[in-house]
């Protein structure tokens, strides 16, 4: 993804391209609803006019409309719930705590035997 962003012009590289997990859920649901409705509407348009091309144009137009709504990471739709990451622990603390955990596990297994 970073390689694709690097190919963009400089002003576009400044835009954020990430959405949060809740935003992904909203985007997926919006995509499903719009395209399902477009399929139903396209079917009736094609049936009433007896033109398959009208049905296809209806669905393709809805697909373009959906892409315009879903693809940009709109901050008011898809980035409302940012992910809060835990701060990384230092290596010494991590290794000493994992050593202590291993010792505790060994003690527990000896006690149970």
Curated annotation (Swiss-Prot):
Principal location class: endoplasmic reticulum
Transmembrane segments: 33-53, 58-78
Subcellular location: Endoplasmic reticulum membrane
Disulfide bonds: none
InterPro entries in alphabetical order: Spc1/SPCS1
Region (Disordered): 89-113
Family that this chain belongs to: Belongs to the SPCS1 family.
Function: Component of the signal peptidase complex (SPC) which catalyzes the cleavage of N-terminal signal sequences from nascent proteins as they are translocated into the lumen of the endoplasmic reticulum. Dispensable for SPC enzymatic activity.
Biological processes annotated in GO: protein targeting to ER; signal peptide processing
Name used for this protein in its record: Signal peptidase complex subunit 1
Lumenal-side segments: 54-57
Source organism phylogeny: Eukaryota, Metazoa, Ecdysozoa, Nematoda, Chromadorea
Gene Ontology annotations for the cellular component aspect, listed alphabetically: signal peptidase complex
Membrane topology of this protein: Multi-pass membrane protein
Subunit-level organization: Component of the signal peptidase complex (SPC) composed of a catalytic subunit sec-11 and three accessory subunits spcs-1, spcs-2 and spcs-3. The complex induces a local thinning of the ER membrane which is used to measure the length of the signal peptide (SP) h-region of protein substrates. This ensures the selectivity of the complex towards h-regions shorter than 18-20 amino acids.
Organism: Caenorhabditis briggsae
Membrane-side (Cytoplasmic) residue stretches: 1-32, 79-113
Keywords: Endoplasmic reticulum, Membrane, Transmembrane, Transmembrane helix
């Amino acid at each position: 993804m970073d390689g694709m962003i690097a190919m963009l012009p400089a002003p576009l590289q400044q835009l954020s391209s990430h959405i949060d997990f809740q935003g992904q859920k909203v985007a997926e649901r919006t995509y499903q609803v719009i395209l399902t409705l477009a399929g139903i509407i396209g079917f009736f348009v094609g049936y009433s006019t007896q033109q398959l091309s009208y049905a296809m144009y209806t669905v393709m137009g809805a697909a373009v409309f959906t892409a315009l709504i879903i693809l940009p990471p709109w901050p008011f739709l898809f980035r409302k719930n940012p992910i809060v990451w835990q701060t990384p622990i230092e290596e010494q603390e991590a290794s000493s705590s994992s050593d202590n955990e291993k010792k505790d596990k060994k003690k527990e297994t000896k006690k149970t035997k």
